[in-house]
Amino acid sequence: MSRAPLPLAAHERLIFALDVPGHDEAIAWVDRLGDSVSFYKIGMELLASGEYFHVLDALAKRDKRVFVDLKFFDIPATVAGTIRRLAQWPVSYCTVHGWHAGMLQAAAEANHGDMRLLAVTVLTSMGRPDLAAMGIDREPVDVVVERALAAQAAGIDGVIASGQEAGPIRRATGPDFSIVCPGIRPGGPVGDDQQRTVGVAQAFTDGADAIVVGRPIRQASDPAAAATAIQDEIRAALPQNGN
């Protein structure tokens, strides 16, 4: 059975994508951003450095939340074993591939910690032509909602999906299902590899629990100020009785 979304304070609803090649660069970013960011996503680039869990441990010691974004996809037994081990670490979110019901169920059953599992639906870098090339001639929103419902039925706690689909997902799954949205572009589309993007306010108005932001902060002249500005947008978009 899916668990309720994490009880996130407003400042924890911004997740910074820590896409860097190693430990030293990661910690430099954490120090640079200071109190403007309290939640970090660590993914495949750091894993390849061999310093992944050193970074995870360093973030936890700084009282930061951690999102492990490794998109696990394998036979059910292998994914279950991985989730069982990872649940022993101080991890708030972890991604699993959202296209295999048996694997999703095995992952959910193996998750005995406080970690929330998020199913990957359709990457925000993909549009309908990309799906068609895979033999799926449907609109991304239809595929995403279908995958979200399948993940919920398997006991997964939420999904990671474009903010463009946050509203349809929320209406389909109800309030007790986590929605985390990457591909957020505070200033609008910028012509990078993200196709299905939205702004900060729209994501939260449509039902997102948290957003993932990378390049708009990382490439800003003052990254901490950029993160703080996004935090202000989040607070303005949340209900008045929100955290």
From Swiss-Prot:
This protein's record includes keyword Lyase: yes
Catalytic residues identified in the record: K71
Cellular component GO terms, alphabetical: cytosol
SUPFAM superfamilies linked to this entry: Ribulose-phoshate binding barrel
Function: Catalyzes the decarboxylation of orotidine 5'-monophosphate (OMP) to uridine 5'-monophosphate (UMP).
Complex formation: Homodimer.
Protein's recorded name: Orotidine 5'-phosphate decarboxylase
Origin species: Xanthomonas euvesicatoria pv. vesicatoria (strain 85-10)
Gene: pyrF
